[in-house]
From Swiss-Prot:
Keywords (A to Z) from UniProt: GTP-binding, Hydrolase, Membrane, Mitochondrion, Mitochondrion inner membrane, Nucleotide-binding, Protein biosynthesis, Transit peptide
Domain of life assignment: Eukaryota
Annotated organism of origin: Oryza sativa subsp. japonica
Membrane topology, as annotated: Peripheral membrane protein
Lineage: Eukaryota, Viridiplantae, Streptophyta, Embryophyta, Tracheophyta
Protein name: Translation factor GUF1 homolog, mitochondrial
Record-stated family: Belongs to the TRAFAC class translation factor GTPase superfamily. Classic translation factor GTPase family. LepA subfamily.
């Protein structure tokens, strides 16, 4: 008992000089959370969090275009507050996944709690021992449009955002998209012009762009270099002074916004939450507004920067909750978690994931189906936004039809399957969700072209396809080729302006079908790599669409069926059969490759059979002997063609992906 009393006195002494000391204590929570001095409802560390009322809490995010220095800036802020050590040896600390580090993007939202003493910059810190300490929650969100719903939910937990812009590259397409996401969320936006140490940096030009595009006062911009540390000392004071504290009612029943979740093999589902009202304690009973299920809080704490148990979270604070959820499908992003058996109003904005791109995944080797099934099951434990249903293809066997939020989401999922689980898969042509209306007035949403039966008795009266609003920023000399590319992809121009003397901004409404494979690659090619591209979901529009089947020896290959615009059907069909002819190996029998719309064949190629010279041993003699041998060979090849199967190599499917959306 004497030891416990001494520990409590020691803990109180830590607090006396100011809450700044908590940051050091939190880096070694085991010193405070011993079995003797840690009551179930938070212990010493939990009571320290109580020193931070909402007025001394700031929740903010960092938003930027790819490679503008967002992750490096986050690292420097974590170092500046002592949350991680300088030279920690792990750049991009908050990017945990290998795919995030390789691509320089954020896929999973991460949070980090920092403690910062805000002193008067006009006076030396030694003269301000009682300067107030603030709790700062950095919520690192994905930046790509595929994850826009997750971003909107994460931004809903923030009151401000740092808008990072490269001092040399200036405003890019994703900068614009992210600004409007933050603007529509009513966040206080602090512009940060980064990389001012670069030889080509032009901060004044970037300030002018911010003024022209977003009406941001140039004097509000902070000039920094996350690499050298120049100007970083002004960032956190600006966060405290310009970003408001989180609203909330401390004396109300607990209400939390679920930001993200991931699965841990030992702890189950770990949820990142922002406490909007009340306080959450270990042992509390909570319920989900979306599912109605009830859970017991097994553990609660903050990310500092790793899981740090505190036993309690107060109003305005951001942290993690472990409550015994068995699957991330129970933890729906944007859901409201609240005190069980209490009537609370759910936080606005929750909606289920909307899948915009669908693709079939099949094992490269049919015997690996169980291994692929296990890999997808484990991966979806950490990505509940993927929809998975089993399907069977006559050409590829057993597989899965997966729905994704967008192109990048699909690409990242494939990469994680390969890197984290070693799965080798065949992907079918990506499709988007179409809506077809039949003559009798019934409507159906089609995600798999093979499911659209060519039924002559059920006439298709109308078709609708999803569209996007694409934002393209390019050097002005490439405007002509880009306009031509967008026109070829059935685009409608919405906006055409000049950002400055050298760069133009184009906005087009484009069918999602036209950009899901190679649009970005072709855009980069015709602009010598200078274009930046981003898009946001728009409405459905009526279109003239047809289903195209690929037939091998008269038999349709369901995995190769696709839906195309009627005007492009013949050209796309011609390119598909040409590609297949190059990649399908010759057999002992002739192979007919056809592209058909309904009962009409619009393109055809013939792969001739390999032929054995059956006359090699006939030296002269009666001609009827030679004819007999040739007729026998001909009959044998007919029989082989009738019962033989055509092997389609994996490379053929990869090539079809490139053709299906080519210009």
């Amino acid at each position: 008992m004497a030891g416990a009393a001494a520990l409590r006195r020691s803990a109180r002494r830590v607090v006396l000089p100011g809450a700044y000391a908590l940051s050091r204590a939190l880096q070694h929570p085991e010193r405070l959370l011993s079995s003797q001095a840690s009551p179930d409802r938070g212990g010493v560390l939990g009571s320290e969090l109580g020193l931070y009322p909402p007025e001394r809490v700031r929740n903010f995010s960092i938003i930027a275009h790819v490679d503008h220095g967002k992750s490096t800036l986050a690292d420097r802020l974590l170092e500046l507050t002592g949350t991680i050590k300088k030279g920690h040896g792990q750049p991009q600390y908050l990017d945990k996944l290998q795919v995030e580090r390789e691509r320089g993007i954020t896929v999973k939202a991460q949070t980090a709690t920092m403690f910062y003493r805000h002193a008067n910059n006009q006076l030396p810190a030694s003269d301000q021992p009682d300067a107030p300490s603030y709790l700062l929650n950095l919520i690192d969100t994905p930046g790509h449009v595929d994850f826009s719903y997750e971003v909107s939910r994460s931004l809903a937990a923030c009151q401000g955002a740092l808008l990072v812009v490269d001092a040399a590259q200036g405003v890019q397409a994703q900068t614009i998209a992210n600004f409007y996401l933050a603007f529509e969320s009513n966040l206080s936006i602090i512009p940060v012009i980064n990389k001012i140490d670069q030889p080509t940096a032009d901060p004044d030009n970037v300030k002018a762009q911010l003024k022209r595009l977003f009406d941001i006062d140039p004097s509000e911009a902070l000039l920094t270099s996350a690499k050298t540390g120049q100007g970083l000392s002004q960032v956190l004071p600006a966060v405290i002074e310009r970003i408001p504290s989180p609203p909330g009612k401390c004396d109300s029943p607990v209400r939390m916004l679920l930001l993200d979740s991931y699965y841990d093999e030992y702890k189950g589902v770990i949820c990142h939450v922002a406490v909007v009202d009340g306080a959450l304690h270990k042992g509390d009973k909570i319920a989900s507004a979306a599912t109605g299920r009830t859970y017991e809080v097994l553990d609660v704490g903050i990310m500092h920067p790793e899981l740090t148990p505190t036993g309690v979270l107060y109003t305005g604070q951001v942290g993690y909750v472990i409550s015994g959820m068995r699957s991330t499908k129970e933890a729906r992003i944007g859901d409201t978690l609240h005190q069980a058996k209490s009537i609370v109003e759910p936080l606005p904005g929750f909606k289920p994931a909307r899948h915009m791109v669908f693709s079939g995944l099949y094992p490269a080797d049919g015997s690996d189906f169980d291994a692929l099934s296990h890999a997808i099951e484990k991966l979806t434990c950490n990505d509940a936004s993927v929809s998975v249903t089993k399907e069977t293809s006559t050409a590829l066997g057993m597989g899965f039809r997966c729905g994704f939020l967008g192109l990048l989401h699909m690409d990242v999922f494939h990469q994680r399957l390969e890197q984290e689980h070693g799965a080798q898969v065949i992907s079918t042509i990506p499709t988007v969700p179409y809506i077809f209306e039949y003559g009798d007035g019934s409507k159906v949403q089609v995600e798999n072209p093979a499911a659209l039966a060519s039924n002559p008795g059920k006439r298709i009266a109308a078709c609708w396809e999803p569209t996007v609003i694409a934002t393209i920023i390019i050097p002005s000399e490439y405007v002509g080729p880009v306009i031509m590319l967008c026109s070829e992809r059935r685009g409608e121009q919405q906006e055409y302006t000049f950002i400055d003397a050298q760069r133009a901004l184009l906005k087009y409404r484009l069918p999602l079908r036209e950009i899901i494979v190679d649009f970005y690659n072709e855009l980069k090619s015709i602009t010598s790599g200078y274009a930046t591209f981003d898009y946001e979901d728009s409405e459905y529009q009526q279109s003239d669409l047809v289903k195209m089947d690929i037939l091998l020896n008269g038999q349709p290959v369901d995995a190769m069926a696709t839906i195309v615009h009627n005007q492009k059907a013949q050209r796309v069909g011609r390119e598909l059969v040409d590609k297949l002819k190059k990649f399908i190996e010759r057999q002992m029998f002739e192979i007919t490759i056809q592209a058909a719309v309904g009962s009409k064949v619009i393109a055809r190629e013939t792969l001739s059979a390999m032929r054995k010279n059956v006359l090699a041993k006939c030296y002269g003699g009666d001609i009827t002997r030679k004819k007999k041998l040739l007729e026998k060979q001909k009959e044998g090849k007919k029989r082989m063609k009738r019962v033989g199967s055509v092997d389609i190599p994996q490379e053929a499917f990869h090539e079809l992906l490139k053709v299906s959306n080519s210009k």
